[in-house]
């Protein structure tokens, strides 16, 4: 395919147009008075959202060069979302600011490499300064505040706070759609382990790329399943029940995996295969945990059991299992309460006798998975559109809360970024490195400027007053008042803020150091078929 190439200023200008189109669409959602964006969907009603990464992923531009710029900013939002689960709009605003300030200087003759070096140095200093002013998050009330700020709902903050209290900060919390109008919290027994499906063709929800199995059987073995004949009798028995099957094995390969996938695609029966969690003796112990939780038996040579001889009585059962590409969650296993209690007691006794910190950590993980549970926040709303929007907000809030527990919090509303300006400005740099530092200094103001603008205030006035205010004091855009941000509950997780800044600086630097852009030329339209010889155009109605 032929390529279209742009160089230097032309290349950067085209990419920046794409950056602006995406950033201008996303940044209107920033802050407590941020607006919504309506996204057209191929099927069903439009999606109304203020979630930055959701908006960014939907944007596709016609011009190839502009689209590359937009996609790079979308990557900033996605990466920030992957790391911290929130802060995607802030990351987008920071990227646009660094790109614009940087482009002015590059166009004026500054060296892009020197600017990049200065940006990286200034960003690293800002991140260290953010960590230095972070405050740890502990207690139900503090956790509720973080969640409430992210979701813009005190009620959601209470749900997430209660869920984390009941299943632990690292417990499994899922978000589902409720059949009613009200949002509610349920905590159900369950277990999660870090192994996902072996083939993406096993998913039942192509949009979320997850496999949801209702009332499934569970085959648990430490063996490798390569020959489909080994489990064929068992598969035939499961097929008669018309219930799905989860296979947890050392591996599923050879002819077995494609055979299972083919039957899933054809709709013969629903099956998902995952690798067994852990390694060595720990794997055997975890498989036994799963078997006890689900009322099944581990098919292992240690017990003299073979796959080909396995019967339905060896299979575990559960009310529901959810499998994505990275993890499996088993909810309401059918194991007996007595057997589970005995297993928990055994693990506790091992905890008391072990002298290894590593073993203690792994035993505590197993104990939490057996004795803990899965918290389910069931989201209710009057309409499907409102339901989707609420789910996205709760997901953001949950991620932000976990990030806050992990690395602490700082004053929200962009206040912390203004606070660290003094540390960055103190950097003694020269030449283009100093120019890079100054670009970051200007970009650090941009989130506050945009939050104020979205709330109907003049950003420059707010920034000037903020720079001269006592530490911790900031502008509450929701009320127009100057308050102690942390005491008022306007807070941001450090992990979210630093990830947004680091990812924005990284991608913006790449755009500034771009000297050539190569894109596919659009395919020419196919010519219309030739008219047969001797045919009068008037025969076509004169058109």
Swiss-Prot record:
It comes from Streptococcus pyogenes serotype M49 (strain NZ131). Keywords: ATP-binding, Chaperone, Cytoplasm, Isomerase, Nucleotide-binding, Stress response. Forms a cylinder of 14 subunits composed of two heptameric rings stacked back-to-back. Interacts with the co-chaperonin GroES. It catalyses: ATP + H2O + a folded polypeptide = ADP + phosphate + an unfolded polypeptide. GO terms for cellular component: cytoplasm. Its main location: cytoplasm. It holds the Pfam family Cpn60_TCP1. Its EC number is 5.6.1.7. NCBIfam families: GroEL (TIGR02348), PRK00013.1 (NF000592), PRK12849.1 (NF009487), PRK12850.1 (NF009488), PRK12851.1 (NF009489). GO terms for biological process: protein refolding. It is an enzyme of class 5 (isomerase). This is Chaperonin GroEL. Belongs to the chaperonin (HSP60) family. The gene is groEL. The lineage of its organism: Bacteria, Bacillati, Bacillota, Bacilli, Lactobacillales. ATP binds at residues 29-32, 86-90, 413, 476-478, 492. The keyword Transmembrane helix does not apply. Together with its co-chaperonin GroES, plays an essential role in assisting protein folding. The GroEL-GroES system forms a nano-cage that allows encapsulation of the non-native substrate proteins and provides a physical environment optimized to promote and accelerate protein folding.
């Amino acid at each position: 395919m032929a390529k279209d190439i742009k160089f230097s200023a032309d290349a950067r200008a085209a990419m920046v147009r794409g950056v602006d189109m995406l950033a201008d669409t996303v940044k209107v959602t920033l802050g407590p008075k941020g607006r919504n964006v309506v996204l057209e969907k191929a099927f069903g009603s439009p999606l109304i959202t203020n979630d930055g990464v959701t908006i960014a992923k939907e944007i596709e531009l016609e011009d190839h060069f502009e689209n590359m710029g937009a996609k790079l900013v979308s990557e900033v939002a996605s990466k920030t979302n992957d790391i911290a689960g929130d802060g995607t709009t802030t990351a987008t605003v920071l990227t646009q600011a660094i790109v614009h300030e940087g482009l002015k200087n590059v166009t004026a003759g500054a060296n892009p490499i020197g600017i990049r070096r200065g940006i990286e140095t200034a960003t690293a200093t800002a991140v260290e300064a953010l960590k230095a002013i972070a405050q740890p998050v502990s207690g139900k009330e503090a956790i509720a505040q973080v969640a409430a700020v992210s979701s813009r709902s005190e009620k959601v903050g209470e749900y997430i706070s209660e869920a984390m209290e009941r299943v632990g900060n690292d417990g499994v919390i899922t978000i589902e759609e409720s059949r009613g109008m009200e949002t509610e919290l349920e905590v159900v027994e369950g277990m999660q382990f870090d192994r996902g499906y072996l083939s993406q063709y096993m998913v039942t929800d192509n949009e979320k790329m997850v496999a949801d199995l209702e009332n499934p059987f569970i085959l648990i073995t430490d063996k490798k399943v390569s020959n489909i004949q080994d489990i064929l009798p068992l598969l035939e028995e499961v097929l008669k029940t018309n219930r799905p099957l989860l296979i947890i094995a050392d591996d599923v390969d050879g002819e077995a995996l494609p055979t299972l996938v083919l039957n899933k695609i054809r709709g013969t029966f629903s099956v998902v295969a995952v690798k067994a969690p852990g390694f060595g003796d720990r794997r055997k112990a975890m498989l036994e945990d799963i078997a006890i939780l689900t009322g099944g038996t581990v098919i292992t040579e240690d017990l003299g059991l073979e796959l080909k001889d396995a019967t339905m009585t060896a299979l575990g059962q559960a009310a529901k299992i959810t499998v994505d590409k990275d993890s499996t969650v088993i909810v309401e296993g059918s194991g007996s309460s007595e057997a589970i209690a005995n297993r928990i007691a055994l693990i506790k006794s091992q905890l008391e006798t072990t002298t290894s910190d590593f073993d203690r950590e792994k035993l505590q993980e197993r104990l939490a998975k057996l004795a803990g549970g899965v918290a389910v926040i069931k989201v209710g709303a009057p309409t499907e559109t409102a339901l989707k929007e609420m789910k996205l907000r709760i997901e953001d809030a949950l991620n932000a809360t976990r990030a806050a527990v992990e690395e602490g919090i700082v004053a929200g509303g962009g206040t912390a970024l203004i606070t660290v300006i003094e540390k960055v400005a103190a950097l003694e740099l020269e030449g283009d490195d100093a120019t890079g530092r100054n670009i970051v200094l200007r970009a650090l103001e941009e989130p506050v400027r945009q939050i104020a603008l979205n709330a109907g205030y003049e950003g420059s006035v707010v920034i000037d007053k903020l720079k001269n205010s006592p530490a911790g004091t900031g502008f509450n855009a929701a009320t127009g008042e100057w308050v102690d941000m942390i005491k008022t509950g306007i807070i941001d997780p450090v992990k979210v803020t630093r990830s947004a800044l680091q990812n924005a600086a990284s991608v913006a630097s790449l755009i500034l150091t771009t000297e050539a852009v190569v894109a596919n030329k659009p395919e020419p339209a196919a010519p219309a078929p030739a008219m047969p010889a001797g045919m009068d155009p008037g025969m076509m109605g004169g058109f």
